[in-house]
Amino acid sequence: MLSTVNNNIVIALDAMGGDFAPLSVIHGAGFFLDNLVDPGIKVFFHIYGDKEEVSPLLLKYKKVSNNSEFTHCSDNVLANDKPSFALRHRKDSSMKAAIVAVKEGKAFGVVSSGNTGALMAISRFILGTLPNIYRPAIASICPTKTKSLALLDLGANVDCNADSLFQFALMGSIFAKIALKIDNPEVALLNIGTEEVKGNDSVRGAFELLKNAPGINFKGYIEASEFLEGNIDVIVADGFVGNVMLKTAEATASTFINLIKQEVFNSWIAKMLVGILLKSKLNKALTRFNPKIRSGAMFLGLNGIIIKSHGNSDAISFAHAIKFAVNAISENLNQKIINGVSHIE
């Protein structure tokens, strides 16, 4: 059941998390309300932060103020806080208050640009995991040459056993159905080869669990070289490998895009030719890889919707992270995960 106020979907916002907070958060909430709300859906915010910094922004962004409730918090989690320190000592932080709001039923989900490790630690401590879920995983949507795919885990679990990878695959499949709107997503395990004998014990063990598992369209192994080809819908890895692969792919894409801009737009003649011949196709390709519209990573498996926006998110990026949360809530993602793993003993 959705957490609502007057039939609105309620989202808790950590106003102090991120490099450009609280402006990116409040402006982002305003951008979301103005541009990204789907017809028939109403969204209400619980905003947590420092009143001296947030209150002036709420006076400026009237639409946010009219669709929110603000709570002052005397502390905030810093970017360099260790998760254990944030959990024990940031008792009145905006991040913790937002998560507690979910625990108490005041909101159904949280959006934060704050410290990833702290957000996971506090969320797991306060909310716990869904029934039958051993470990939560961080999942995100990534662009490829032809379409988008879901990738998990992105850093929540450095070491994973076969059972955890198996659960990540189940959760990733359900996540992809909602986030990518695919009826029967194809799922693969990231490995150093496609042969069944390749990989470590955890990966091979997960393969054995998945190859005959009901309710999942498992396609075996995939190599990192195929990541951007768009031949699969969900890629599953442990948190160490997944995080390294994602950051490598992001850096490669960023370098390539900047190289294209540098080489193509280095003269007015090139700009004119591109404008005439390739502008629409180039803009379409650049939009597909635009990080602003893919700002949110989701903590799957927790007893509440938690969205982590990039630490350097601007208002537009944060707005898209809010939309990510709203979609997950409106589609009842967590209940579908519970149903999808209910057969696990």
Swiss-Prot record:
Keyword annotations for this protein?
Answer: Cytoplasm, Lipid biosynthesis, Lipid metabolism, Phospholipid biosynthesis, Phospholipid metabolism, Transferase
Annotated GO biological process:
fatty acid biosynthetic process; phospholipid biosynthetic process
Q: A single Gene Ontology molecular function, please? A: phosphate:acyl-[acyl carrier protein] acyltransferase activity
Supply the SUPFAM superfamilies for this chain. Answer: Isocitrate/Isopropylmalate dehydrogenase-like
Where is the protein localized?
Cytoplasm
Taking the first listed entry, what is the main subcellular location of this protein, grouped into a coarse class? Answer: cytoplasm
Q: In which pathway does it act?
A: Lipid metabolism; phospholipid metabolism
**What EC numbers are recorded for this enzyme?**
2.3.1.274
Please state which protein family the record places this protein in: Belongs to the PlsX family.
Q: How does it assemble?
A: Homodimer. Probably interacts with PlsY.
Q: What does this protein do?
A: Catalyzes the reversible formation of acyl-phosphate (acyl-PO(4)) from acyl-[acyl-carrier-protein] (acyl-ACP). This enzyme utilizes acyl-ACP as fatty acyl donor, but not acyl-CoA.
Could you tell me what this protein is called?
Phosphate acyltransferase
